Amino acid sequence: MSKKNNLLVAASGTGGHIFPALAVSKEVEDEWNIHWLGIQQRLDANLIPQKYNLKTLNLKTPRKNIFLFYQYIKILMSTFQIIRILKEKKINLVFTTGGYISAPTIVASKILKIPIIIHESNVVPGMVTKYFGFLCNYVLLGFKETNSYLKNCKTIFTGTPLREQFYKFNFLPEWVPKGNGPLLIVMGGSQGAKAINQILYESLEFLIKKQFRIVHIVGESHLKTFHVKNSKNYIQKKFTNEIAALIQNCDLVISRSGAGTINELMEAEKPSILIPYPYSKNNHQEKNAMILAASGGSVLINQNNMSKEVFEETLERIFKIKSKKGKKNYEILDLMKKNMENNNKIKSKNEIKKYIDYFLKEF
């Protein structure tokens, strides 16, 4: 058997950075030895398989613009650490998904003339992609629209890779409320979302009265604040590993609009109400949500405009029953479903694998 080359995967932070990197790693692990680089304070080590040779750096992520002077110093110091790692592990190629760990990794790789691929999941590119992307051999895009922001980069549209469970059908978990009412999945991303939790809490009586079945992923940090006793039609969880099954089998998703969520909804062809996080960098969550809203598969509600009345009126409109030829259906919901089916889907991890494996010919 020929000796494998070494791939460094640099990914840390939220699920939006980590899950695409995990999907790609799994896809290429037969051809590459995977080494994972993350930030100790910004990575759940339990998510990374032991075989991926995890290495973490003790770096404090900047709270503000990474291009303030003192941040240059931090990046410089981190770069020296990463150069040492790249040499020790004899890395042949670097793949990263953005975030603070990416900047020094890209610089270190460029100094050592190691090829670099970065994947950008959001419509509006993050600061690392925007300012360091030109140093990379390829900038892979989750959305075609991102190309207009990166004129000086070698960009290729690949889509965003998802967790494996989204590429197969999953049965609804037994613990989900039973009944004939529409099933809502309410979630706020890996960090939880206080505003979404609050509006659901305020509207819970209305939802149960209307016979909605609700699975509420509240997020660990908000579990105590928004704890509501589970009932026949309402289940609250801080986290679940069965998110693909829930999304695939529900009627509507209510969520933030991180890039990962948008792509999961597209893969599952599932309608949604999207409430973008208003403080996301470059307002990227709203730009993400606009992709699905423009297609007619989602209703976009800005958090500043959100209220109990707006939320309940939106649900009533989506789930308004209309009789047609003696048959009752949700006309608006059915139209949203049809619009989601028309969204182009791409097997992203296969596309990304092609560009990673391209470099095998170079070694």
Curated annotation (Swiss-Prot):
Signal peptide: none annotated. GO terms for biological process: carbohydrate metabolic process; cell division; cell wall organization; lipid glycosylation; peptidoglycan biosynthetic process; regulation of cell shape. It is a peripheral membrane protein. It catalyses: di-trans,octa-cis-undecaprenyl diphospho-N-acetyl-alpha-D-muramoyl-L-alanyl-D-glutamyl-meso-2,6-diaminopimeloyl-D-alanyl-D-alanine + UDP-N-acetyl-alpha-D-glucosamine = di-trans,octa-cis-undecaprenyl diphospho-[N-acetyl-alpha-D-glucosaminyl-(1->4)]-N-acetyl-alpha-D-muramoyl-L-alanyl-D-glutamyl-meso-2,6-diaminopimeloyl-D-alanyl-D-alanine + UDP + H(+). It holds the Pfam family Glyco_tran_28_C. It comes from the Bacteria. It is found in: Cell inner membrane. The keyword Ion transport does not apply. GO terms for cellular component: plasma membrane. GO terms for molecular function: UDP-N-acetyl-D-glucosamine:N-acetylmuramoyl-L-alanyl-D-glutamyl-meso-2,6-diaminopimelyl-D-alanyl-D-alanine-diphosphoundecaprenol 4-beta-N-acetylglucosaminlytransferase activity; undecaprenyldiphospho-muramoylpentapeptide beta-N-acetylglucosaminyltransferase activity. Its main location: membrane. Pathway: Cell wall biogenesis; peptidoglycan biosynthesis. Belongs to the glycosyltransferase 28 family. MurG subfamily. Cell wall formation. Catalyzes the transfer of a GlcNAc subunit on undecaprenyl-pyrophosphoryl-MurNAc-pentapeptide (lipid intermediate I) to form undecaprenyl-pyrophosphoryl-MurNAc-(pentapeptide)GlcNAc (lipid intermediate II). This is UDP-N-acetylglucosamine--N-acetylmuramyl-(pentapeptide) pyrophosphoryl-undecaprenol N-acetylglucosamine transferase. The lineage of its organism: Bacteria, Bacillati, Cyanobacteriota, Cyanophyceae, Synechococcales.
